[in-house]
Amino acid sequence: MTIKLHHLRPAPGSKTERTRVGRGEGSKGKTAGRGTKGTKARKNVPVTFEGGQMPIHMRLPKLKGFKNRFRTEYQVVNVADIERLFPEGGDVTIEALVAKGAVRKNELVKVLGNGDLKVKVSVSANKFSDSAREKITAAGGSINEV
């Protein structure tokens, strides 16, 4: 006889109903498996409680400062990256940088001045550092803040 899907049954004893405690003397009533007296019988002890020892969250130092919720994060592209990705020069837009895999789409882009630039490029980005501005204009290129 071949075994089919509708012949399968769970192993005997593997599917038992949850025991409801504290529902009568005959079925785990009264103390309901908690033993007699003491804190654990009367109420729950917090998971973080370490038995009176100074807890870990109080032993560790506090972190200084805060995280500014309104900070604008920029993806960084260096002048050296533009030189490497666009060796023939031309228009460098955010869409072109996304297509080349230099930045992720739908995020702000800032051009920084690390490296050298020898080709003439027209760069469009959200922000530029002062050194990047100098290097792009020195190479004969132009800057467009979007």
Curated annotation (Swiss-Prot):
This is Large ribosomal subunit protein uL15. Binds to the 23S rRNA. Belongs to the universal ribosomal protein uL15 family. Part of the 50S ribosomal subunit. GO terms for cellular component: cytosolic large ribosomal subunit. PANTHER family: 50S RIBOSOMAL PROTEIN L15 (PTHR12934), LARGE RIBOSOMAL SUBUNIT PROTEIN UL15M (PTHR12934:SF11). HAMAP family: Ribosomal_uL15 (MF_01341). InterPro entries: Ribosomal_uL15 (IPR030878), Ribosomal_uL15/eL18 (IPR021131), Ribosomal_uL15/eL18_sf (IPR036227), Ribosomal_uL15_bac-type (IPR005749), Ribosomal_uL15_CS (IPR001196). The lineage of its organism: Bacteria, Bacillati, Actinomycetota, Actinomycetes, Mycobacteriales. Keywords: Ribonucleoprotein, Ribosomal protein, RNA-binding, rRNA-binding. Residues 15-28 have a biased composition (Basic and acidic residues). One of its GO terms (molecular function) is rRNA binding. Residues 1-45 are annotated as: Disordered.
